[in-house]
Amino acid sequence: MRPLCVTCWWLGLLAAMGAVAGQEDGFEGTEEGSPREFIYLNRYKRAGESQDKCTYTFIVPQQRVTGAICVNSKEPEVLLENRVHKQELELLNNELLKQKRQIETLQQLVEVDGGIVSEVKLLRKESRNMNSRVTQLYMQLLHEIIRKRDNALELSQLENRILNQTADMLQLASKYKDLEHKYQHLATLAHNQSEIIAQLEEHCQRVPSARPVPQPPPAAPPRVYQPPTYNRIINQISTNEIQSDQNLKVLPPPLPTMPTLTSLPSSTDKPSGPWRDCLQALEDGHDTSSIYLVKPENTNRLMQVWCDQRHDPGGWTVIQRRLDGSVNFFRNWETYKQGFGNIDGEYWLGLENIYWLTNQGNYKLLVTMEDWSGRKVFAEYASFRLEPESEYYKLRLGRYHGNAGDSFTWHNGKQFTTLDRDHDVYTGNCAHYQKGGWWYNACAHSNLNGVWYRGGHYRSRYQDGVYWAEFRGGSYSLKKVVMMIRPNPNTFH
C-alpha cells in the first residue's frame, strides 16, 4: 500500500501543478472566469475520465493577483516589432523628406521654366512683329524697284526716241550736204558750159568756111576718182546707212571732151577696181587718200571705204573715225552691223564689212589717238579679225606694240555688245553705261565708240567718253581717234 500511496501523491502534486499552470493559462486566455471555477472544472473532468482509479483532492489556497502579469517569453518579440516599426517610420520619414525636397526642387524648376516660357512667348511676339515689319519693308522695296524699273523703261524709251530723232536729223543733214554737193556740181557744170559756148563762138568766128562745127559735149568738173564700172555694179552694193549716203555723193563719169579743151588727166592706165582692200588699190597706183570701192574675197559684197594712203606705208582701210562728235555712236545692233556715219568724216564701217575684210587674210590693227593738247600716240596689234555674226563678232587680237599703252587686249575674245544685244560678262549691260557699242568685258579699258566730249576731261555719271585707259585714263575724252587695218607683212609700223 505504501508504494501505491507515494505514487498517488506524485500524481496529485502533478495535478496541482497542472492546475496552477491551467490557471495561468486561464488568466491569459480569459478575463471573466475565476480560478476556483477552473479548478472545480478540472476536478470534475478528471473524475469523469477515470472512475476505476483512486483519486486524491488537494486544496490549494487561492492566490489573488494584485498587479499586472508579465510574460517574459513574449517581451523580446514585442521589442523587436517596436524596433522594426521605428526603423520603418524613420525610413518613411526620410523618404518623405526626400520627396519633399524633390517637390520643392521641382517647384523651383517650374517657376524658372514658367519665366522662360513667358520670355519665349515675349520673344515670339517680338519675332512676329519683326517679321511683319520686315514684310512691310520688303513690300516697300519691291514697290521702289518696280517704280525705278518703270522709270528706267521710260528713260530707255526716251533715249530711243532721242536716238531716232538724232538719226533723222543726221539723215536730213546728210541729204542737205548732198544737195550742196549737187548744187556745186551743177554750178561747175554750168560754168563749164558757158566757157565751152564762148570758145565755140570764138572758134566759129575764126573759121571762114561755112562748114558746121560739131558741138562738143560739156566737160566734166573736177571730182574725186570714181571707178567707171561703178554704174554697172551699183545695185550690188549693200544698202546700209553709209552706202546710202555714199550713193547720193556719186558723180557721173566724165564724158570725152574736145582735144582743144582742158580736161582732167585720164586714168585709164590704172585699174578701176573694185579692190580686195586699200593696199591693193595702192599697189595699182592709187596713192590718194579718198573713197574707194572694195570687194573682199569669197563674197559678192561691195562696200565703199576710206583708204588712208598717206599714213606710212599707206594701204590702210579705215574702219572707224572720231574727230568732231557730229555722229551719234549710241546705236542698236543692226546699225552697228551695217555701219553708219559719213565716210569722209565720223563713221563706223560696219561689223559685217569688217568681218569680210579681216577674214580674207592676216590683218593688223592700228589705232591712232590725239588728245586735246595735240599729243599723238598709237597702238598696233599684230593680228586683228572678227568671228561671224553667229559668234556675235567675237574679237581676236594679236601682240601689242606702240606708245599708247595696251587697253585693248583686255577685250580680246569678247563678243560685241550694243544697247539691245547684251553679250558682255557684266551682270548688267555695259553698253547702257558706256553709251556705245564695243567688245565689252566687264566693262571697258577702252571705249572708242563712246560719247565724244569736248575739252578732254568730262563729268558724267558713268565713264562713257571716248577713252583709252592707258592713255589719259577713263575720265578723259580723246579729240581724235582712227582705227584702220592693213595686211600684215609681219613688221611693226
UniProtKB/Swiss-Prot annotation:
Signal peptide: 1-22
Subcellular location: Secreted
Example GO molecular function: signaling receptor binding
Keyword set, alphabetical order: Coiled coil, Disulfide bond, Glycoprotein, Secreted, Signal
Boundaries of every Fibrinogen C-terminal domain copy: 269-489
Disulfide bond positions: 278-307, 430-443
GO biological process, one term: cell-cell signaling
The keyword Flavoprotein appears for this protein: no
Organ and tissue specificity: Widely expressed in heart, small intestine, spleen and stomach. Also found in lower levels in colon, ovary, adrenal gland, skeletal muscle and in prostate.
Post-translational modification: N-glycosylated.
Superkingdom per UniProt: Eukaryota
Cellular-component GO terms for this entry: collagen-containing extracellular matrix; extracellular exosome; extracellular space
Gene3D superfamilies: Gamma Fibrinogen, chain A, domain 1
Signal as UniProt keyword: yes
Glycosylation sites: 164, 192
Pfam families referenced in this protein's UniProt entry, alphabetically: Fibrinogen_C
Family annotation (InterPro entries): FIB_ANG-like, Fibrinogen-like_C, Fibrinogen_a/b/g_C_1, Fibrinogen_a/b/g_C_dom, Fibrinogen_CS
Residue runs in coiled coils: 76-115, 152-206
PANTHER family named among the record's database cross-references: FIBRINOGEN ALPHA CHAIN
Functional summary from the UniProt entry: Induces sprouting in endothelial cells through an autocrine and paracrine action.
Protein name (record): Angiopoietin-related protein 2
Species of origin: Homo sapiens
